[in-house]
A protein has these predicted regions:
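Solvent-exposed loop/turn segments flanking beta-strands in beta-repeat/beta-sandwich domains
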Residues: 61-83, 171-184
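C-terminal motif of bacterial Sec signal peptides marking the signal peptidase cleavage site
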Residues: 13-16
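Short acidic/polar inter-strand loop motif in beta-rich domains
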Residues: 63, 93, 117-126, 191, ...
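Short, well-structured beta-strand segments within conserved domains
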Residues: 52, 56, 108-118, 168, ...
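Short coil/turn motif common to extracellular beta-sandwich-like domains
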Residues: 47-55, 65-72, 158-167
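Short beta-strand segments within Ig-like beta-sandwich modules, predominantly Fibronectin type-III
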Residues: 91-98, 188-196
């Protein structure tokens, strides 16, 4: 009986240790910068099936190519290569590996962000690497401060659960220790981010993980801007 109780206590202790693993957030280093990469809108047309056809001009960036340091950073990677992240009203992005594609849009207003993404889904962060536009009633001021959520997204399995990319896109704003900041809440663990850069999460528990990103001012107050805050749930199996 004592042996059984000891075994149960051992199992409970191990389970408790596994569940209490510390969540950490670290800056991702070493990605190719693609300082001259550029995307611009070539055309947006509405076809007979009520689908919008988007065409983008992309230069100094190869869609479909594998980003050079994919293996080294150990992040979930798309086998189809580099692509465009296409976000509507700060919803989950769709990935596009060519510069021409079609999308169905809501009848209401659609704020659209398209930016260049490395094959492991890290955004290219330069002033020419994104397009921001809107289609519809045009109620949103595109000069507002924006934080768009990008990663993590969806379900992660196996080794991909060990290291998750945290990435977001800032437009018309900057963050710094003295100014605006991004507050990231991962389950119940909070981080204050003062540099716009890619980050990775480690120590996440299996199951559902809730991620909340908030653009806040120097006083830590939520900035009144479209799509702020951003909340997502991802699953680790």
């Amino acid at each position: 009986m004592k042996k059984i109780l000891a075994l149960i206590l051992f199992i409970v202790t191990i389970s408790s240790c596994n569940n209490s693993k510390k969540i950490t957030l670290s800056k991702l280093e070493g990605s190719p910068p693609y300082l001259n990469a550029k995307i611009s809108t070539a055309s947006i047309t509405l076809d007979d099936d009520n689908e919008y056809a988007f065409s983008f001009d992309v230069s100094d960036y190869e869609l479909g190519a594998k980003t050079i340091n994919t293996v080294e950073n150990q992040l979930a990677n798309s086998g189809k290569g580099q692509h465009i992240h296409f976000i509507i009203n700060n919803g989950p992005y769709s990935a596009h590996y060519t510069n021409n594609f079609k999308k169905k849009l809501n009848k209401d207003n659609n704020v659209i962000l398209a930016f260049l993404s490395r094959s492991y889904h890290e955004s290219v962060k330069n002033q020419n690497a994104f397009v921001l536009t809107q289609i519809g009633e045009e109620k949103v001021d595109l000069n507002s401060e924006f934080l768009f959520y990008s990663r993590p997204k969806g379900t992660y399995k196996g080794k991909d659960t060990e290291k998750l990319l945290l990435d977001f896109y800032l437009i018309n704003t900057t963050i710094s220790p003295e100014g605006n900041k991004v507050k990231a809440t991962i389950n119940d663990t909070e981080f204050i981010i003062t540099e716009w850069a890619p980050y990775y999460l480690q120590g996440l528990p299996k199951g559902n993980v809730k991620i909340k990103l908030e653009l806040v001012n120097s006083e830590g107050e939520l900035i009144d801007s479209p799509f702020n805050p951003s909340i997502r749930n991802v699953t680790l199996e």
